[in-house]
Amino acid sequence: MRLYLLRHADALPGADDAQRPLSPRGEQECRCLAKFLERAGIEFEAAYTSPLLRARQTAERVLATCRAREDLQAVVTDNLSNETSARAFTDWLGRLSAAKHVLLVGHMPSLAERLCALLEVEPSAAFRLPKAGLAALARDESGTVTLKLFVSPKVLGLK
């Protein structure tokens, strides 16, 4: 199984954090990342997102442009919110279907913490996922997880 941990793209500021939409830059980040994923031949079979608007919009924009099952919609889950414990996230992840390519859209700092936990590295070595940053992980049958790809908007040519 390949897991793609994606931090939501840039969002507009706002008083209601849960309802902050993507900014024009965030829309551009999504297009750029989705085109990269499409060129890489990655076809998502499952997708999950935090309930916050900017994460849902990021998932929608990426899935609309890159290769994915035609009817694939991101499932909204609290397991990708910052309030969910690492243990609850790990338990949830263990119950996911055996899809080959799974997109997970969430937030900092929890995505970096989950990344460290999955890779079995110290949290002090936390990865910094920029907005619209993506970490691709491979999990084999034995449960061993390896980092396969780390992409940021800067790497894709966005300043």
Where would I find each of the regions flagged by the language model?
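Alpha-helix capping/helix-boundary segments
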Residues: 54, 110-111
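Short phosphate-binding loop-to-helix
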Residues: 78-98
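Active-site-proximal alpha-helix that buttresses catalytic centers in soluble enzyme cores
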Residues: 2-84, 125, 129-132, 159
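Glycine-rich phosphate-binding loop signature in dinucleotide/nucleotide-binding domains
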Residues: 40-42, 95-100
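Domain-level recognition of soluble alpha/beta enzyme cores
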Residues: 119-148, 153-156
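Alpha-helical structural signal in soluble globular domains
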Residues: 36, 61-66, 92, 114-117, ...
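Generic beta-sheet signal
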Residues: 3, 98-106
